[in-house]
Amino acid sequence: VPPSNDDIRDELVRHNVELQRFSRGLARRMRAIINRAEPRFRAELKARLDNIAALGFDPGPVTTRRMRSLERFIKAINDPTFAEVNQTVRSELVALAKLEAQTGAAIITGQLPVVFALTIPEQRTLRSIVFARPMERRILRDWLAGYEANDRRRMMDEIRQGLIFNETPTQISRRIFGRSELGGTDGTREITRRGAQTLAQTTSAAVFNGVLAALYAANKRIVKKEVYVATLDSRTTAICRSLDGEVFPQGEGPMPPIHINCRSVRVPTIDGRGVGTRPANATTEKALAGLRGP
């Protein structure tokens, strides 16, 4: 069967599904870093809460200062943990960008009926995709800062609520970290652990699609159009379902990810006239005719 744009699409979609394994692995590593630091964090926070309880709680300025001091403490003790998380995410996404530039090119050229070398985006372009390309209107630095800030905000909300309802430090700690017999899944911190998957999947999808977009732009002589391909299942959003199969000029139109946990991808439509006709034989000519279209 001669190669065609359908073959390129199928291979890129299959690779996009495999990429979700990468995001799950990255999320596991993020959670492992957080979990490793949690016992010490839990003990030190409990000691601080014991001190606040011993001094008494009231809605006045003294308690307000203690709460501000507590939030600074939480940030200080959390900073090394999230610094390690951030470094892990950054380094793995940079490695992903470099790998996907080569993989994307190999997938496309592997389906062409002639020997053809694609132009690979420069290293600085790949790094810019990781660090400067917006993902859901935020760059990577903002995603990572928000991940830590939201974790801290949720903990402070639980502490304030616990103090207002006169809960013990043990009860407040349980609110945050959950019960050990349930693996902490009933605590507010579990939201942070689950959020690792959202962050990993959305950022890795952004890097993957950004690299493909750069690859198409670097080879616009043969990539004239792109097709939006959604992963169609029960989790597909209405917007991605409506865009599935839509064809756009190269570099124009909506670029995935267009929402949190987006799994869509844009695949190229190769113009056979830009590829050429070497080596010339009947099989190649037939395949090129399929690439050119009617």
Task: Describe the residue ranges of each PLM region.
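N-terminal leader/targeting and assembly helices and adjacent pre-domain segments
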Residues: 1-186, 273-294
